[in-house]
Amino acid sequence: MAVKQISVFLENKEGRIEKAIDALAKENINIRALSIADTSKYGILRLIVSNNEKALEALEKANFIVRENEVIIVAVPDKPNGLNSTLEVFEEKGINLEYLYAS
């Protein structure tokens, strides 16, 4: 299934993640999934949320740089080798994964 993801660009300093999450909480936006990637100076908070339009507005109002892009969601079998068998399908189809969420 295809969904829209929000990427929030953050300085890697204390309180920045909390400020972004707080901006969403104040608008009653549910975070369905998140991923954080960082370097020593900057990070990217990637989010799947309940209402992208409101989330983008709230984050921009809180002075964050944000982008929205399409991603796909795949249910992975909850068993040994479940992730591997799913990744094999992507490889067979020539689909490159840039990153992934997992739980």
What is each residue range found by the language model?
Residues 1-103:
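A conserved regulatory-domain signal marking ACT and ACT-like small-molecule sensing domains
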